């Protein structure tokens, strides 16, 4: 068990950002969900309204006491309400650190667009020229979550 690991940026489904052509959420899921999170006390305006997907293999995220957990978020009519947790994190890229959040839609309430168990979705400020294949170092608050193999 650890609270820090290196991972590789991987392509996501494009649904969170609204880039997926076949998505019913043209604005992007994060943009649609943000007002619901704000109403529950979490402001996302410091972050790009898209996720950075990082494969931490062989590590996978295990929630402990996330900073925020919101149950039964009714953000769309396309599917039933979802539960989301957010874990505070720091990401280091080329020696520069930025604060962000692990965005964790609970798989048991997420009807589609599942990620492999070793992939975490991050909400971060815009990182210039970030590309798939880049290595990032993820640091979690160990009280909120851990990484296990």
Residue spans for each PLM region:
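Glycine-rich active-site loops that engage anionic ligands at enzyme catalytic sites
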Residues: 70-129
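Loop/turn positions that initiate beta-strands
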Residues: 133-138
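Anionic-ligand-binding alpha/beta catalytic cores of soluble enzymes and soluble regulatory domains
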Residues: 2-78
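Conserved "cap/hinge" positions at secondary-structure junctions
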Residues: 124, 140-142
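An N-terminal domain-start capping segment
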Residues: 1-2, 125
């Amino acid at each position: 068990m650890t609270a820090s690991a290196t991972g590789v940026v991987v392509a996501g489904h494009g649904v969170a950002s609204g880039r997926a052509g076949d998505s019913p959420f043209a604005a992007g899921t994060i943009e649609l969900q943000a007002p619901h999170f704000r109403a529950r006390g979490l402001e996302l305006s410091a972050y790009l309204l898209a996720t950075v997907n990082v494969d931490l293999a062989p590590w996978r995220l295990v929630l402990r006491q996330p900073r925020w957990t919101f149950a039964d978020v009714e953000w769309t009519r396309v599917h039933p309400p979802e539960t989301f947790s957010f874990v505070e994190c720091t990401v280091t890229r080329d020696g520069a650190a930025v604060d962000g959040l692990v965005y964790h839609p609970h798989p048991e309430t997420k009807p589609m667009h599942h990620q492999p168990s070793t992939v975490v979705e991050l909400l971060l400020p815009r990182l210039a020229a970030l590309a798939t294949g880049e290595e990032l170092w993820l640091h979690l608050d160990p009280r909120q979550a851990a990484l296990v193999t």
